[in-house]
């Protein structure tokens, strides 16, 4: 690439840097980008660059594949209902060990390797996420039945004071999705849903979902069917038609929840693409799917 082209790329980002200066972006970090070393580097560099150009990234991470591996090593079989992990006491201890004990620290170390200042938290830190036990329902034979997911929670409220202080002090917060209930008992939270609630509570400009797919497509096997921009009503029609199914539905519900709580836009990008977050934010066309309110 010649030097002029490099300059043009930098200049293309300028209006977006100006527009989003001092804004908060919540990044839900999951999927392949968490287990591939090169992808980890791309994400870490993207986050540090955002911070240095005046944007405030707040990371909420998952860890499904690593939790599954840890469970299998201990002779437990992972079980999911509607994309949510069934969590007994032993599973919860494994989840906390992997999320708080390993993944969170690894992300913090990677950010600091590239010049960022970062602090690892969980929803327990500073009473960040108060949660309640989630009640899940299934439809069987046209009958609505309640299913016990175990120690799985849903966000009741988010206290942003601690995260606000860290952002103001130029740190990149990294949050594990573990909440506490009114009895101070730990609950496992779906990371997508927690990220949406945190984004809403933080008055974030954007929620960016780093996933294993390019975005929302009519045909998952045909990249040409990728939608660059969708509204909530268009998304809801795609769910009705069965285009969006399975584990993608909790992600979409989290996206819609964030938009309804005041987040201006939600983006779904593929963490397997080098610097996908920067390409989505700082280029006209973007690289994934942007979702907006109607």
UniProtKB/Swiss-Prot annotation:
Site location (Transition state stabilizer): 28, 251
Listed CDD domains: AAK_NAGK-C
Enzyme class name: transferase
Disulfide bridge partners, by residue number: none
EC number: 2.7.2.8
UniProt-annotated location(s): Cytoplasm
Stored SUPFAM superfamilies: Carbamate kinase-like (SSF53633)
One CC-aspect GO term: cytoplasm
Keyword set, alphabetical order: Amino-acid biosynthesis, Arginine biosynthesis, ATP-binding, Cytoplasm, Kinase, Nucleotide-binding, Transferase
Chief location bin: cytoplasm
One annotated GO biological process: L-arginine biosynthetic process
Pfam family, one: AA_kinase
Catalysed reactions, as listed in the record: N-acetyl-L-glutamate + ATP = N-acetyl-L-glutamyl 5-phosphate + ADP
Sequence similarity: Belongs to the acetylglutamate kinase family. ArgB subfamily.
PANTHER family referenced in this protein's UniProt entry, alphabetically: N-ACETYLGLUTAMATE SYNTHASE, N-ACETYLGLUTAMATE SYNTHASE, MITOCHONDRIAL
Physiological role: Catalyzes the ATP-dependent phosphorylation of N-acetyl-L-glutamate.
HAMAP family the UniProt entry points to: ArgB
The protein's name: Acetylglutamate kinase
Gene: argB
């Amino acid at each position: 690439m010649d030097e002029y082209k490099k300059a043009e790329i930098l200049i293309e980002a300028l209006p977006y840097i100006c527009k989003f200066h001092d804004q908060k972006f919540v990044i839900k970090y999951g999927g392949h980008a968490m287990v591939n070393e090169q992808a980890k580097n791309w994400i870490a560099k993207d986050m540090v660059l955002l911070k240095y150009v005046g944007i405030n990234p707040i990371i909420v991470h998952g860890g499904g594949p690593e939790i599954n591996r840890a469970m299998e090593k201990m002779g437990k079989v992972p079980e999911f209902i509607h994309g949510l992990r069934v969590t007994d006491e032993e599973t919860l201890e494994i989840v906390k060990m992997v999320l708080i004990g390993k993944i969170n620290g690894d992300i913090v170390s990677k950010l600091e390797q590239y010049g960022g200042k970062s602090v690892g938290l969980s929803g327990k830190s500073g009473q960040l996420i108060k949660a309640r036990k989630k009640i899940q329902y299934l439809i069987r034979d046209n009958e609505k039945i309640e299913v016990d997911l175990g120690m799985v929670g849903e966000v009741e409220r988010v206290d942003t004071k601690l995260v606000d202080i860290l952002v103001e002090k130029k740190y990149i917060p990294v949050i594990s999705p573990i909440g506490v209930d009114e009895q101070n008992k730990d609950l496992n939270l779906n990371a997508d849903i927690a990220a949406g609630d945190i984004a809403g509570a933080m008055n974030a400009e954007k929620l960016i979902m780093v996933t294993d797919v390019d975005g929302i497509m009519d045909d998952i096997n045909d990249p040409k069917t990728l939608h660059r921009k969708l509204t909530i009503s268009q998304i809801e029609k795609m769910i009705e038609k069965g285009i969006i199914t399975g584990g993608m539905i909790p992600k979409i519900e989290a996206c819609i929840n964030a938009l309804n709580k005041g987040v201006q836009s939600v983006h779904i990008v593929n963490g397997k693409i080098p610097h996908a977050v920067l390409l989505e934010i700082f280029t006209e066309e973007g690289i994934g799917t942007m979702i907006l309110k109607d």
